[in-house]
Amino acid sequence: MYKRQVSKAVYESIKNSGAKIVDATCPFVLKIHKIVKDASAEGDQIVIIGNEKHPEVEGIMGWSETPVHVVDTVEKAEKLKLDKSKNVRVVSQTTFNYKKFQDLVEIIKKKEYNICISNTICNATEERQNEARRIARRADAMIVIGDSSSSNTRKLYEICKTECQETFYIQTLSGLELDKLKSSDCIGITAGASTPNNIIEEVYTNVRRKLCTDVR
């Protein structure tokens, strides 16, 4: 089985070796590969909103026939310089912070390039982020559950931390310090897409039982 979250060169190398390929890639990622491949073939400059070191972004970069620019901060967006005589195609890492994506795109748009923007953030990711933001605004404390290396969970943490100062990032129940939550009347819980349901339930049940507070 091959998850096509790598460059075109790697994909072609495996294909040419004669190995059987079972492509189990998320369709959202495949869509980005096609957008970048087709746009760059037309000579468009490619801008990816995302983390340059993330495997997904590294893979997307490999599908472009023209130079790729990766932007993930306001500073990089402001410093971005492109050829105004050529079209610009903007895509996003599927798990990128949606609000941050919008903010960075607005900065790039002000540069008056001939730009085409493709919001390629996964719908499920966007909905999860919006829900986490809504809960964090009403909570006294937030618990974000997920693997420390998970991109989408880190984004959830950043969003919650912005809305609720008392936000805690844990991988399992063992990482939760209940003493820090005792003064909270309302505690919100959210989790990354790949976090097992049993871990989420365990955290929820323990917080509810031991703190006897409003948990959302």
What does each model-found stretch correspond to?
Residues 69-75, 94-101, 120-130, 148-149, ...:
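A general structural motif
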Residues 78-111, 132-135, 144-145:
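Internal active-site segments that recognize and position negatively charged phosphoryl groups
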Residues 141-151, 155-163, 167-216:
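C-terminal functional extensions of proteins
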Residues 21-22, 35-41, 46-74, 78-82:
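Internal gly/pro-rich beta-alpha loop/helix module
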Residues 1-2:
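Conserved small/polar residues in nucleotide/adenosyl-binding loops
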Residues 107-141, 146-147, 154-169:
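Active-site rim loops that border cofactor/substrate pockets in soluble metabolic enzymes
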Residues 15-20, 65-66, 105-115, 158-166, ...:
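Short helix-loop-beta junction
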Residues 75-84, 175-183:
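Short amphipathic alpha-helix with an adjacent loop that forms part of the alpha/beta core around
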